[in-house]
């Protein structure tokens, strides 16, 4: 079980209460698909992912990026039981979609980068530490079914 300080809980809640899902979600997923092109294989039904411009302008990529961020809301609301919160998604991604669990970490890094760029100086070391801890716990939960 993960131990959360009151400060970490506050930081994470504050980040998500001010999150611009429509901006950060599409940018983060686009960045992941561009920087790590092998992750595109899981999105073949999304249409044209031929180059960076096509990925950035792809409505399906944008919608899924938003969906992913809203999926993180579930973890924020259930910080004391993140593993159980994502158990079904872990099963889906491992048994049906066959997603490499390392891709969750790559996407979490992209989310962090895009959020940091958006927040600027407000993305302090303390904020980064709490946010990355949260994402690491979610990534671990999503990878549980693989173990």
Swiss-Prot record:
InterPro entries linked: Globin, Globin-like_sf, Globin/Proto, Hemoglobin_b, Hemoglobin_oxygen_transport
Globin domain segment(s): 3-147
Name the UniProt record assigns to this protein: Hemoglobin subunit beta
Organism of this sequence: Trematomus bernacchii
Primary role: Involved in oxygen transport from gills to the various peripheral tissues.
CC terms in the record's Gene Ontology section: blood microparticle; haptoglobin-hemoglobin complex; hemoglobin complex
Organism superkingdom: Eukaryota
Sequence similarity: Belongs to the globin family.
Subunit architecture: Hb1 is a heterotetramer of two alpha chains and two beta chains.
Residues bound to heme b: 64, 93
């Amino acid at each position: 079980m993960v131990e959360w300080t009151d400060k970490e809980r506050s930081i994470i809640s504050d980040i998500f209460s001010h999150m611009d899902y429509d901006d950060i979600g599409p940018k983060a997923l686009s960045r992941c698909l561009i920087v790590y092109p092998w992750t595109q294989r899981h999105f073949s039904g999304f249409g044209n992912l031929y180059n960076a411009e096509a990925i950035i302008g792809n409505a399906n990529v944008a919608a899924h990026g938003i969906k992913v961020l809203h999926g993180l809301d579930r973890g924020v609301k259930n910080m004391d039981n993140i593993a159980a919160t994502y158990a079904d998604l872990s099963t889906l991604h491992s048994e049906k979609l066959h997603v490499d669990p390392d891709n969750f970490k790559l996407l979490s890094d992209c989310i962090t980068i895009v959020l940091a760029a958006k927040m600027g100086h407000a993305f302090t070391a303390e904020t980064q530490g709490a946010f990355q801890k949260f994402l690491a716990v979610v990534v671990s939960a999503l990878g549980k079914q693989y173990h």
